[in-house]
Amino acid sequence: MKKLLLAIVFSIASILLNAVEQKLLSEKEPETLTNVRILGKTNKSPLSYLPGEEIVFTFTLDTGKDKPGDWRFHFRHGGDGLKIQNGKAPVNKPLIVKTSLTKPGFAFCEVTLHDASGKRIYSETVRPNRKKLKREIIFSAGAAVQPEKLKDCGEPADFDTFWDQQKKRLAAVPFMGKVEKKLVREYKNGYVYAISIPSAGPRPATGYLTIPKNAKAKSLPIHVSFFGYGITKQVPPPVISSRLINFQVNAHGQKLEQNEEYYKDFFKSIGGKGYAYNQKHNKDPETCFFNGMALRNLRALEYVKTLPEWNGKDLIVKGQSQGGLQTMWVTALDPAVTEAHPSIIWCCDLAGSLKQKRFGAFGRVKYTPALEYYDPVFMAKRIRKAKIVITRAGLGDYTSPPSGLAICYNNLATPEKTIKWYQGSNHTIIPPEAEIITWTAGKKVEK
């Protein structure tokens, strides 16, 4: 009898343990793979379609050395003037999605990999610093109908007058003899300084300046870089170049070399993660967050041009996303800039979604007429001499939509201009061996 009871107890315990194990398995983290990727392509060069022509996206799964699982494609597609459509498909055969546009614009199809329960599957890579990076398995494809014909929605009549007034505001705040310059690092080949420069607006222009050791007067080019959107403490660069002066400009005018409590309070004071999204402030071009940022950027350039080591010729600016936005501002507003390298430029064609039914950006600052004074598509018209290389425009990037970048490129007045379109790229991910289409000097070059 005792043996029978023990057998029953063990049997029940086994059933319960198995149930718990199955529950835990069902709640486990999504699969993480190292070799699996989604491949995507179009039936012709993605920027060469005509109105009404069928656009065909084809996607396949490459599992590499990983064993295929019980997976599904999840996809959504849409575009300028199109409604979003969603779907699911098996991964054991090509996924084909067809669409078309009746006028110049962009279409997209985004495909992600999911398990049978609907959870996304991720890839894992190891960075050079040995830290693991986890990313979703995704392909963000895009295609366009006559993108070279896309136009902006019209600029404010007093655009130039407004910026003349802002430059006068900046000039009314002198900075010569008032710059705070503190040595914070010394490397074998140079120095790093924390810089604070008086500026118009609520805060000074700040950033880290690097100057090589033994630099002679009028001997070096200057590189100025701008940062993407975020609220993080800026830290000194870990390395410096012996061949140039570099100024990394802070987007917010934060004090440098402060304790964590300062940065916590500072970011709260400027609006936290939504610092540029305040609708009340964005009703007026002089009260929006971008105003102080732009003035700090211009003041930063004014300062570096006073450095005795500058060769007086080469002033190169760069940045991506919000940094690309700032890069466009200073290149348009300071004729001393000789070369600019913006990437995935943020806030292009802010009015396009409302006025032209172009597919709007995810997480973009909501359009107001006041923000038109900061739109890169209008700044582009004022860039007449500097060499411009838009180093990346993602055909599937709807944080910085491709329609806006196409208009930005089309509007550039300079004869030296280039844009590189990346197939499958969204705002953060570039597929390995991505198809790149390069336009240069107004001509399309297929690669």
Question: What do the predicted segments below correspond to?
Answer:
Residues G118-G154:
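Short beta-strand elements
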